[in-house]
């Protein structure tokens, strides 16, 4: 076998692919990354992901493998488990953890598989109101998420005027629906969740309470927002958003006494084996050991003072972003933010999510279109979601966010000019840009400003790619 095939660098072995990767690196460096679920991970995490650990199969749990040669893989996974507990200040006699899920969606589905019977009942925040697909989303005509296909799901919602979760209505619906599991989690909700109230509702209906803290797990680790662990039976998370680790998932589960009966008999948690067996062999095969190592080093970073200061700055930047946009006439769902993201309602200025996302993208500001409270269709959303984790990782602070607000405002104003010609349909919007030299020029000029500004901030990772 040719040693060259095995030992060449990517840029030598596959320059076509490498050139595309370099273009993506340049895009990340030159643009303002404001997708709330994205971040720039550290060099140690990237080194784990590209290490020899990629080569090893290790089905099963540490010291209970179906393959030989896992002595050091076991050490790494146990280290990742211990550090995950330490990052959230958890006692091993009270909490267990599984670090094998490939990402957040598999982690959530493993919980459902383990503790909810087929066609059992689940409640989660509705997707148009800020929930996640895996929390059971369906429409009047179609079950969209596998959660809604294999389980019976019932959404709870926000108040359409305030944008805040209607806990009273949630309690009322839960009393009628009697879910096996209630999910306290979100993908686009800018306020801290009331885990105590969730716990009360779950207890009133004999339900398990699961927090999906994928978006805010870094903030929780840093102690800058309330923790779900005091009140929840299960906590799931991704590790690549505010936690700034690899693309992976983690499941925390309670151990020990769950409750005490009137006669004094203790009722014990039985989550550990159910969840572990749901992950493997229920849903997955061999775990991704390179990702588990990356979880271990990311969790170590999460216990540092530097990480805590970073998370504080993420929130400061998000709040400054809201203040700046409000001062320029934009509406923010819930009136502001407690976390890392802002949901901008564009109905008041005559825009929609899709054209807003597109014009910002053309100006090198990356975000995503998003439903806002009161939207009827998830296919035609009225807002955009903006996040500060990635910008904060690059070193932006409040004064820099003021500049970012200016860029966003100017891009959206260009979008409004285009809409006057094209209307709100995205295909017509794009066509108007292509056919109008003045629109093109305005976009190109703003893009150049944005990219020159963005390039002045460092980008973590490898220099070349």
Swiss-Prot record:
Enzyme Commission identifier(s): 2.1.2.1
Domain of life according to the entry: Eukaryota
pH dependence: Optimum pH is 3.0. Stable under acidic conditions. Retains over 70% of its original activity at pH range of 3-6.
Pathway assignment: One-carbon metabolism; tetrahydrofolate interconversion
Any Pfam family: SHMT
Any GO BP: protein homotetramerization
A GO molecular-function descriptor: pyridoxal phosphate binding
Temperature notes for this entry: Optimum temperature is 30 degrees Celsius.
Catalytic reaction equation(s): (6R)-5,10-methylene-5,6,7,8-tetrahydrofolate + glycine + H2O = (6S)-5,6,7,8-tetrahydrofolate + L-serine
Residue positions, PTM N6-(pyridoxal phosphate)lysine: 241
InterPro entries: PyrdxlP-dep_Trfase, PyrdxlP-dep_Trfase_major, PyrdxlP-dep_Trfase_small, Ser_HO-MeTrfase, Ser_HO-MeTrfase-like, Ser_HO-MeTrfase_PLP_BS, SHMT-like_dom
Keyword vocabulary terms for this entry: Methyltransferase, One-carbon metabolism, Pyridoxal phosphate, Transferase
Enzyme class: transferase
Free-text tissue specificity from the UniProt record: Highest expression in the ovary and testis. 6- to 7-fold lower expression in hemocyte, silk gland, midgut and fat body.
Result of altering residue 135 to A: The kcat/Km for tetrahydrofolate is 1.7-fold lower than that of the wild-type. The kcat/Km for L-serine decreases to 32% compared to the wild-type
Cofactor: pyridoxal 5'-phosphate
GO cellular component: mitochondrion; nucleus
PROSITE patterns for the chain: SHMT (PS00096)
Keyword Signal belongs to the record: no
Keyword Transferase: yes
Family from the record: Belongs to the SHMT family.
Quaternary assembly: Homotetramer.
The protein's role, per its UniProt record: Interconversion of serine and glycine.
The protein, known as: Serine hydroxymethyltransferase
Native species: Bombyx mori (Silk moth)
